A protein has these predicted regions:
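Membrane-interface helix-loop junction between the first two transmembrane segments
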Residues: 52-58, 89-91
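Hydrophobic alpha-helical transmembrane segments
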Residues: 59-69
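Small-residue-rich helix-interface/hinge motifs
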Residues: 68-120
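Metalloprotease/metallohydrolase-associated module, dominated by Zn2+-dependent proteases
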Residues: 2-53, 108-130
């Protein structure tokens, strides 16, 4: 059997190599999309639970609506807080690249060695403002 016809993980489409990183702008769009969907899901679940509680009057529905409200509040506050940090860093022209796989709340890195104290303060203040 020739080398070209041998089946290996690389030729099967499964590679053990590190995936190619997306450009910063594409990772920003991916993070915005993921966070937008998380916001939409949180608000939708809370609204559905609240509508159920209001129309049924069940204590279970009211309890679930309350739990959904706290969950939605936490998700919304976290996302706005992190985007505030990101906005503060970018306004100050900080070296703040997007993370390789922006799927969680944290969407960018801040390099303390490459940034000034003023850039750090701008990034820091952005979180509570968001």
């Amino acid at each position: 059997m020739s080398e070209a016809s041998q089946t290996t993980p690389e030729t099967d489409g499964v590679s053990s190599l590190k995936p190619i990183s997306l450009p910063d702008a594409q990772r920003l769009k991916l993070a915005a999309r993921n966070h937008g969907l998380a916001l939409l899901a949180a608000i939708t679940l809370w609204a559905a639970a609240d509508a159920w509680a209001m129309t049924s009057g069940l204590n279970l529905a009211t309890g679930l609506s309350l739990l959904n409200a706290f969950a939605a509040m936490t998700i919304i506050a976290t996302i706005f807080h992190e985007w505030g940090h990101f906005t503060g860093a970018r306004i100050a022209k900080s070296y703040s690249p997007m993370v390789t796989n922006p799927t969680g709340a944290f969407i960018f890195g801040f390099n303390f060695a490459k940034n000034t104290r003023q850039q750090f303060l701008s990034m820091s203040i952005g979180g509570p403002v968001g």
